[in-house]
Amino acid sequence: MADVDELEDPMEEMTSYTFARFLRSPETEAFVRNLDRPPQMPAMRYVYLYCLCKQIQEFSGETGFCDFVSSLVQENDSQDGPSLKSIYWGLQEATDEQRTVLCSYVESMTRGQSENLMWDILRNGIISSSKLLSTIKNGPTKVFEPAPISTNHYFGGPVAFGLRCEDTVKDIVCKLICGDASANRQFGFMISPTDGIFGVSLDLCVNVESQGDFILFTDRSCIYEIKCRFKYLFSKSEFDPIYPSYTALYKRPCKRSFIRFINSIARPTVEYVPDGRLPSEGDYLLTQDEAWNLKDVRKRKLGPGHDLVADSLAANRGVESMLYVMTDPSENAGRIGIKDRVPVNIFINPRHNYFYQVLLQYKIVGDYVRHSGGGKPGRDCSPRVNIVTAFFRKRSPLDPATCTLGSDLLLDASVEIPVAVLVTPVVLPDSVIRKTLSTAAGSWKAYADNTFDTAPWVPSGLFADDESTP
């Protein structure tokens, strides 16, 4: 690896130092040739992170990751520091608990997500939660060449809307729904400590603790994945087709008025699917409640090849979502609170990308709980997972200039007015998780084998059949 002092532009060198470039570097190829067996994941991921952090610490001063790696290395080969071989074997012998500490360092260094330079670099060679479904379907063709993160979003578009409103939804969940529970709302990139090929970034997690710069997840931790629905954004105007149905929901919050509100647009976000039928992939919320069956749509039967979908549907059909209808600040002196709660039979669609997104979050946070001392003996170490659907309206001249969530939490003047929040628990069967991760890991391995001369093994524990790895 080139000395950072010899480079004309150290920052440019660092931003291009991806996992793929590391695997192709002469130093790595020479080191691999001298091993008596192919290198393995996740040790190779941690070796790469050590090399990257060595560069970063030259101008960031952050030495925690490299210092911890050095404590795992048995011998120092030279005055310049341990060799790649010594680092690799130290990391290969590391326990899952020690690997979780390393991943916690990475998470703490990458907070800020898309605004954090290191967060962007680390996506290379990682199957992220947003890429899991496409990897299963099409292979990891973009995993080693991820598209650059764009922060230049049109203000009036759905991406900018979601980014703008996300903090408001976090405030509603933390303050109004969970009652000021201990929460963390700023996460870095969380790499799976046990395999090094999966990674996630969380929106919000409650019932977490802090240990210095680290976040400690516990067996009480609850993940909230936030979705702000741009297609339901409406104005307080008789000419807006959504407004009359919202008015009915606000005046009388109940299942019937909510059904009318959801179906006030051409492509509703909730799909009715009777038992034994296959949902479409169109949107991420389903129901089996006959009250939602407003039009006759033929659906295919669940059959061969739909085992994972059937298992996931069976696990989630009994889920009860909770709808929180918010008060109108124009009628309440600017205060936005919870007006009413309505339980509804709405659950996640296991054919949609968001199901796989929360599946991977569940898996990785569970790893952190198990290997960082956050779980109590005899208790399930798995976190709870919810997907949050938030609905907003545009501000009107009748709204006070200053609006608050609850009595004192100021709502940013640039943010639209929240009108309702739907919290949907997600159940993730173990068999579905195992099969999904096994398929994705096999796809990653096959792609890496065809792309790199020094492709590292994937941990055999990810596969249903250990013969999937050498």
Swiss-Prot record:
<feature type="site" description="Required for function">
    <location>
        <position position="203"/>
    </location>
</feature>
<dbReference type="InterPro" id="IPR034720">
    <property type="entry name" value="Viral_alk_exo"/>
</dbReference>
<comment type="function">
    <text>Plays a role in processing non linear or branched viral DNA intermediates in order to promote the production of mature packaged unit-length linear progeny viral DNA molecules. Exhibits endonuclease and exonuclease activities and accepts both double-stranded and single-stranded DNA as substrate. Exonuclease digestion of DNA is in the 5'-&gt; 3' direction and the products are 5'-monophosphate nucleosides. Additionally, forms a recombinase with the major DNA-binding protein, which displays strand exchange activity.</text>
</comment>
<protein>
    <recommendedName>
        <fullName>Shutoff alkaline exonuclease</fullName>
        <ecNumber>3.1.-.-</ecNumber>
    </recommendedName>
</protein>
<feature type="site" description="Required for function">
    <location>
        <position position="227"/>
    </location>
</feature>
<keyword id="KW-0945">Host-virus interaction</keyword>
<dbReference type="InterPro" id="IPR011335">
    <property type="entry name" value="Restrct_endonuc-II-like"/>
</dbReference>
<keyword id="KW-1190">Host gene expression shutoff by virus</keyword>
<dbReference type="GO" id="GO:0004527">
    <property type="term" value="F:exonuclease activity"/>
</dbReference>
<keyword id="KW-1132">Decay of host mRNAs by virus</keyword>
<keyword id="KW-0269">Exonuclease</keyword>
<keyword id="KW-1035">Host cytoplasm</keyword>
<dbReference type="GO" id="GO:0003677">
    <property type="term" value="F:DNA binding"/>
</dbReference>
<dbReference type="GO" id="GO:0039657">
    <property type="term" value="P:symbiont-mediated suppression of host gene expression"/>
</dbReference>
<keyword id="KW-0540">Nuclease</keyword>
<dbReference type="GO" id="GO:0003723">
    <property type="term" value="F:RNA binding"/>
</dbReference>
<comment type="similarity">
    <text>Belongs to the herpesviridae alkaline nuclease family.</text>
</comment>
<keyword id="KW-0694">RNA-binding</keyword>
<keyword id="KW-1048">Host nucleus</keyword>
<dbReference type="Pfam" id="PF01771">
    <property type="entry name" value="Viral_alk_exo"/>
</dbReference>
<keyword id="KW-1262">Eukaryotic host gene expression shutoff by virus</keyword>
<comment type="subunit">
    <text>Forms a complex with the DNA polymerase, the DNA polymerase processivity factor, and the major DNA binding protein.</text>
</comment>
<keyword id="KW-0378">Hydrolase</keyword>
<keyword id="KW-0255">Endonuclease</keyword>
<dbReference type="GO" id="GO:0004519">
    <property type="term" value="F:endonuclease activity"/>
</dbReference>
<dbReference type="InterPro" id="IPR001616">
    <property type="entry name" value="Herpes_alk_exo"/>
</dbReference>
<dbReference type="GO" id="GO:0039595">
    <property type="term" value="P:symbiont-mediated degradation of host mRNA"/>
</dbReference>
<feature type="site" description="Required for function">
    <location>
        <position position="225"/>
    </location>
</feature>
<dbReference type="GO" id="GO:0042025">
    <property type="term" value="C:host cell nucleus"/>
</dbReference>
<dbReference type="GO" id="GO:0030430">
    <property type="term" value="C:host cell cytoplasm"/>
</dbReference>
<feature type="site" description="Required for function">
    <location>
        <position position="166"/>
    </location>
</feature>
<keyword id="KW-0244">Early protein</keyword>
<keyword id="KW-1192">Host mRNA suppression by virus</keyword>
